[in-house]
Amino acid sequence: MRDVRVEIMADGASKLFGENKLSRPVESLSEAELYEIAALEEKLRSCVGAKAGPFLAWDSVNRAMIRHWCEAMGDNNPAYSDPAVAAVMGTPAGAVIAPPTMMQAWTMTGFGGQHPPGSDTREQNPAMRHFAEHGYLAVVATNCEQEYAQPICEGDKLSGYSTIEFVSERKTTALGVGYFVTQLTEYRNQHDEVVGTMRFRILKYKPLLPL
């Protein structure tokens, strides 16, 4: 199957986020502020390239969850409900395929915040802890890029492996001063085959107004 790449952009993101690196010129920041920035950025650099995983799915890919997703999204593609149509994609006999955009849903923790036994117990994104320690408490998602390598079939059991791929320089935005963080997650099936990847970008920032 040919790789497919999809980018999902948060509405108005290009308007929200500016290009300036600092909220004030460097020379107007106090020595204490500069020290704090340097300390945070040293911690962030140590996080780039950090890998964690596997993070296992609680459930195998199943038709009920596919149906719920499709109903919520208004997606009536017959390959997601009719095994005969899905068979054209090379699925096992009697199986349907899952919407590729649903890829990340299978390994999410849910409200309990826990992954199944056998999952990596390390932080998926240790940079988040460092941001909180330095007062960058607000977060907004900016965009998501997904690439699909092969169909996700009913009965598959997915796992995710995450890497902090990039942390930007300190930026000034209309929301506040912060950093853009890109996290790359690779999704594999029970045969250790890559089914797709997702790059998820967020802005961690100090809000202009109190939370």
Regions found by a protein language model. Name each.
Residues 142-189:
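Hydrophobic beta-sheet segments that form the core/acyl-binding groove
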Residues 188-211:
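Surface-exposed, gly/pro-biased binding rims or lids
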Residues 2-143, 211:
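Hot-dog-fold acyl-thioester-processing enzymes
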Residues 115-116, 122-125, 165, 179-183, ...:
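Short, low-complexity, polar/charged sequence segments that are solvent-exposed and flexible
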Residues 82, 159, 175-177, 198, ...:
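A generic "cationic amphipathic patch" detector
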Residues 60, 147, 201-203:
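Generic structural detector for well-ordered beta-strands
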